[in-house]
Regions:
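ATP-dependent carboxylate-amine ligase
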Residues: 1-126
């Protein structure tokens, strides 16, 4: 959580007049742990729009219980938090974003379940 918060703060400082969309992937065993997730409270507060992504299949592989989007929102203390469990849904949502003066910050120790961010950005003229 501290790395994500510091990264978000640095990007906000660098782009103060831009809309900042922060996307955090929960990927590691600890970040997907229901008892650990509340440590992310207020981590994404500096973002104008905040998104959490995790892949249900990753939970299954790690034999962890499913996480409900409402639990994620509550843990992050952000009612407007968007939660995506499929990278295709995330990709569709991001493609529809207004792009003028918008910074999209991807934060993960994973791969957003194989989402090719560079290809997506090129195809969508980011």
């Amino acid at each position: 959580p501290s790395k994500a918060k510091a990264t978000l703060k640095a990007v906000r400082t660098q782009f103060p007049d831009y809309k900042l969309v922060a996307i955090l992937e929960l990927h590691t065993f600890s970040s997907l742990n229901k008892e650990f997730i509340p440590q992310y409270r207020n981590v994404l507060d500096a973002a104008d729009e905040a998104i959490v992504f995790f892949n249900k299949h990753t939970l299954e592989i790690k034999r962890m219980p499913d996480l409900e989007p409402e639990y994620i929102r509550s843990s992050f203390a952000r009612k407007d938090l968007l939660v995506f469990r499929e990278n295709s849904e995330l990709e569709r949502y991001l493609t529809d974003l207004r792009r003028a003066r918008t910074v999209i910050l991807f934060m993960s120790s994973g791969t957003f379940n194989g989402l090719n961010i560079r290809t997506w950005a090129t195809e969508n003229h980011f």
